[in-house]
């Protein structure tokens, strides 16, 4: 229901072509995505309460937005801000003070919202989000702050190689890949490994990649991806 409230706030903001009010920002920040709740899209299920919710959601969203949201149920899991604050603290201890930052799976922008103010003042940020609703919430929250918000897949984004000082995210993971015709060593890798490989391509020498990812990144029986990463970066 917090998601529905956030979507209604977003529709009002976009319909009136204005920035979010303080109360609307709070509503947008409570948007949790649809990860783990596929019943929200099953209007033929057995639970009447969920069937009603699914019907209301279908009426609320355009067909494209509904399809995009439904496609996000496997990977739309947003990181607890407590964890993100610890990540920023660790990056500061590693000496990061600001620069060109990329968030390639940004959700509604919690990694950006938790960024220390002094680092934010010294940084330029690009944030990519595949899901249409999450991406538009991200833009409503942070677009006016100068964040370059791109709604689409990381694989489709035009990014200069060797550009970013810091790339951080909670990346999607699973036993599936992405459509990538670049013929890179990671092009056919599982999605979480693909994100690591692509991040290293657009990272500048000496830059930092900080990802929350699957344990299969290190545990997978095929060592090819680990060998590629080890040849490109210090772990």
Regions found by a protein language model. Give the residues of each.
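Helix N-cap/beta-alpha junction loops of NAD(P)-dependent oxidoreductase domains
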Residues: 13, 176-177
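Conserved phosphate-coordination/catalytic loops
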Residues: 77-82, 186-193
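Conserved Class I SAM-dependent methyltransferase catalytic core
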Residues: 130-132, 188-235
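Conserved SAM-binding strand-loop segment of SAM-dependent methyltransferases
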Residues: 144-154
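A short acidic, Gly/Pro-enriched loop at the edge of an enzyme's catalytic core
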Residues: 158-168
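A short, conserved alpha-helix within the catalytic core of class I
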Residues: 178-182, 195
């Amino acid at each position: 229901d917090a998601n529905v409230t956030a979507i209604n706030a977003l529709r009002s903001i976009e319909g009136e072509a204005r920035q979010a009010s303080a109360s609307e920002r709070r509503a947008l920040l409570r948007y949790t995505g649809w990860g783990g709740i596929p019943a929200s899209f099953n209007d033929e299920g057995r639970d009447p309460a969920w069937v009603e919710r699914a019907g209301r959601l279908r009426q609320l969203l355009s067909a494209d937005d509904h399809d995009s949201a439904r496609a996000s149920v496997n990977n739309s899991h947003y990181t607890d801000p407590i964890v993100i604050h610890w990540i920023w603290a660790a990056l500061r201890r590693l000496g990061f003070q600001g620069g060109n930052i990329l968030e390639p799976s940004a959700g509604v922008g919690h990694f950006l919202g938790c960024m220390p103010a002094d680092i934010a003042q010294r940084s330029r940020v690009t944030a990519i989000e595949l899901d249409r609703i999450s991406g538009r919430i991200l833009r409503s929250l942070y677009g006016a702050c100068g964040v370059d918000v791109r709604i689409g897949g990381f694989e489709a984004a035009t990014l200069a190689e060797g550009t970013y000082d810091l790339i951080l995210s909670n990346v999607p993971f699973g036993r599936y890949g992405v459509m990538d015709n670049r013929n890179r060593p990671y092009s056919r890798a599982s999605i979480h490994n693909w994100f690591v490989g692509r991040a290293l391509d657009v990272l500048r020498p000496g830059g930092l990649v900080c990802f929350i990812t699957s344990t299969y990144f290190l545990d997978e029986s095929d060592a090819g991806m680990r060998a590629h990463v080890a040849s490109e970066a210090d772990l």
